[in-house]
Regions:
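A conserved hydrophobic position in a structured secondary element of the catalytic/binding core
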Residues: 60, 128, 157
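Pre-active-site segment of Zn-dependent metallo-hydrolases
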Residues: 24-33, 53-119, 131-135, 142
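A short acidic, amphipathic alpha-helical/loop segment
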Residues: 131-136, 164, 168
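Short beta-strand scaffold segments in enzyme catalytic cores
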Residues: 47-52
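Active-site environment of divalent metal-dependent phosphoester hydrolases
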Residues: 46, 65-67, 123-128, 162-165
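Short hydrophobic/aromatic-rich motifs at helix boundaries and adjacent loops
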Residues: 18-19, 104-105, 124
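Metallo-beta-lactamase
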Residues: 3-35, 141, 147-173
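A short catalytic or substrate-binding loop motif that flags glycine-/basic-rich loops and adjacent residues
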Residues: 40-44
């Protein structure tokens, strides 16, 4: 029987997030795609998971982060928007925009075991994610076959996206 004395913040976080657990991971893994079609799952925000009839799996623009977490910086000072930020330039706003996650995290990146490519259309932080990169590098069993040669899962994106991945430790090849 559960006891309140055993509940900690860490247990709550680990037991609650991602909100869907591995439900969607399991659904994707168990889905057989009919010939001549493909399957697609919305991962929240801008993310998509695409699976083909040949069992090719592509994550596109998957973000599993939380956005901004506080109005304040580490010194307790209220954060303001960088005047060069596109929203500040467009609107003249100076108050920090929240960029909070508005939909649940539906896919557990650390439960991904089969993926053929990670794709980021651009480097806005809701299109590219360090958690998925780390999970793919450490957990994926299936390697991509290119021209009959087994290779690591490719991370595909613009120069800015690939530079960001490299800065996180994703290997060049």
């Amino acid at each position: 029987m559960p006891n309140v004395n055993d509940v900690t913040r860490e247990k709550w976080v680990l037991g609650t997030f991602p909100e869907w657990g591995t439900w969607l991971n399991e659904e994707i893994a168990e889905t057989t795609v009919k010939k001549g079609t493909f399957a697609m799952w919305w991962l929240g925000c801008t993310g998509l998971w695409i699976k083909t009839e040949n069992n090719t799996n592509i994550a596109m623009d998957y973000w599993c982060g939380s956005g901004k977490r506080s109005h304040y910086d580490d010194q307790g000072k209220r954060k303001m928007m960088d005047p060069d930020h596109q929203m500040a330039r467009m609107s003249g706003a100076r108050q920090l925009q929240p960029n909070l996650r508005a939909v649940p995290a539906v896919l557990d990146p650390f439960a991904v075991t089969e993926i053929d490519a990670v794709f980021a259309s651009h480097t806005h932080t809701d299109h590219i994610d360090i958690n998925l990169a780390a999970a793919v590098l450490s957990n994926v069993k299936k390697k991509t076959i290119i021209n009959g040669e087994e290779r690591d899962v490719p991370f595909i994106g613009s120069k800015f996206a690939t530079d960001l991945w490299r800065s996180w430790g994703v290997p060049e090849e």
